[in-house]
Curated annotation (Swiss-Prot):
Any one of the GO BP annotations: polysaccharide transport
Membrane topology field: Peripheral membrane protein
CDD domains cross-referenced by the UniProt entry: ABC_KpsT_Wzt
Molecular-function GO terms, alphabetical: ABC-type transporter activity; ATP binding; ATP hydrolysis activity
Name under which the protein is recorded: Vi polysaccharide export ATP-binding protein VexC
Amino acid sequence: MFGLLGCTRYFESDKGPRVVLDKTDFVMGYHEHIGILAAPGSGKTTLTRLLCGLDAPDEGDFIGLRGDALPLGANSFILPGLTGEENARMMASLYGLDGDEFSHFCYQLTQLEQCYTDRVSEYSVTMKTHLAFAINLLLPCRLYIADGKLYTGDNATQLRMQAALACQLQQKGLIVLTHNPRLIKEHCHAFGVLLHGKITMCEDLAQATALFEQYQSNQATIQTEDYSFDI
């Protein structure tokens, strides 16, 4: 099993501790594909970092091992002074993988063509994201975590990436954190909502969407009231 038990994560602010996750429980099997609806600023990135073992909770327990989960599309490991090919081969070497096969896969999936041998510092944001996605797909892990989105680029690029991910998901799990119900409908079979620092699992996507939309509606009402005034 993998996840969090009674985990709290907070950050200090001028107004005191800001609680992002509040004694939340989230446990799953390694082959499950779970979509969690979450509004911007609700703690998606904080949750991703905890589940990937990059941060430790202030309270509670992390179930699993560091390296079990990989943040899909994260590109902080890519070195801008190296070419795309050099970055791919470097990561293959670090994990003891075949450099030729690894690099060939990244070249084929990204279709960067001649740019593959250019320095990453010359890449656009989208090109760098595509390279990171390809590299992450081949790194050893037991499940992927997507924070916000899965793919970028034109339709052809997204179809290639979707097919490559589908192959990996035959043996690996997936967690998608997003505000877009359509994204998790395509890739997940269990659904939840991140609200008020806790994850609530739902019976189906319809229930999760209804709960999420109700929360957004309530937040919009609160914001409207905050800006109201008497004339």
